[in-house]
Amino acid sequence: MHSHSVVNACLVAPYELRHWPATLHSKGALAPKFWFMLDGFFDLFEPVNAPDISNAEGVARIADRIEAHRFDARPMLEGARVALFGVNDGRRSGDNEGCASAPDAIRNWLYQLVPPSDWQPTADLGDIRAGATEDDTYAAVQSVVAEMIQMGIVPIVLGGGHDLTIPLYRALDSVGRPMNIVTVDPRLDFGGDPSIISSRNHMNSVVMHEPNYLFDYANVGHQGYLTDPDTLELLERLQFEAIRLGNLLQNIQQIEPVVRNADLVTIDVAAIRASDHPASTHASPNGMTAEHFCQLARYIGMSDRLLVSGIFEHNPNLDDRSRGAQLVAQGVWHMLEGIFNQKGDHPKCSTEDYLKYVVDLPGELHEIVFYKSPKSDRWWMDVPAPNHEKSKLSSSLLVPCSYDEYVEASEGSLPDRWWRTYQKLA
């Protein structure tokens, strides 16, 4: 039996909404303290080296709209919605080190594309030079991303190796609340010697990082024959999620709630099948299709929770006819389109206008409460925190879900996502 009504915002005050930093509510607001911080900011970057794009057809290109860091000009960051930048460091990518030169290869195709129709101010900061050590590169990336987040700008990072997930995650420390991460990777990048960081084990450093703000983690697209069963078992014990490639291919729409819940999303392009993206030493005959990649990129951009995203491991040295660079550029285009079309849903708004659906369940658990946004038709479910009196969490947490999970609960089954979240809150 179900009922629906308008949600009373006073009764539902999810942790994310109450603790969302004020700086993130006014996108583009540039606090005065950042003016002097930016004095040496662009010294970290090599200016953009993208070629001039012919406009003989009279059609605007991204090259005409983006504010790029050039040798003779710097972009205005005040009011910017998105900031792209590259990282010229692939030293921890092993035999895929050529990914260090990916940013310019991707820009070459991105700048030729027609901009999304709802274009918003976007900057291209240029490329962070490889530091004297890999840790120096990490420090530069972390400081840039942290400043962008505090300024209300969404950074999209073009790597470089997938190990750059580490400084992106560290940059979130300044936000000071529990964080959710999604990686898209054909492997689970754990294991090995944690003291020797590489693009194949960088998640060790993320999970063990202090202070530990990691609340939820999911990997999308792993392939069973590339995955250590012990790592899968570890993720299950931690109430984290690993979604197989087959599940993604069967229904890409089921991945949308996963990325909607993420503050940070990073993609290893080896998750794309080699026939669509050959430019990685780890490219495999199996993987996401080009269409899945672009759809996923749009889902990532559409998330109102997104703080930073990155696409890594593209190796121009292995790119047959630049097909891989074209695809990554198209993925960035879809991510931009998603960001420009965010709906301002939870956690950026009150849920007072959401529809509330109460589903009665048999057994000790009497009901699950679902919410539906009238702006986007997207769904959330309310997960109570059993020991909230002893913690800093509110009495419940709104977790993104799909309509199918609402149907599953209506038929008497407890959704896995609800149970995993409940276990973590307990």
Placement of each model-derived feature along the sequence:
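Intrinsic-disorder-associated, low-complexity terminal segments enriched in Asp/Asn/His/Tyr and depleted
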Residues: 2-4, 19, 25
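Residue-level recognition of conserved structural "scaffold" positions that shape functional pockets
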Residues: 17, 25-27, 167, 228
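Short, Lys/Arg-enriched N-terminal segments with co-localized hydrophobic residues
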Residues: 23-36
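Conserved alpha-helical scaffold segments that buttress catalytic/binding sites
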Residues: 34-84, 89-426
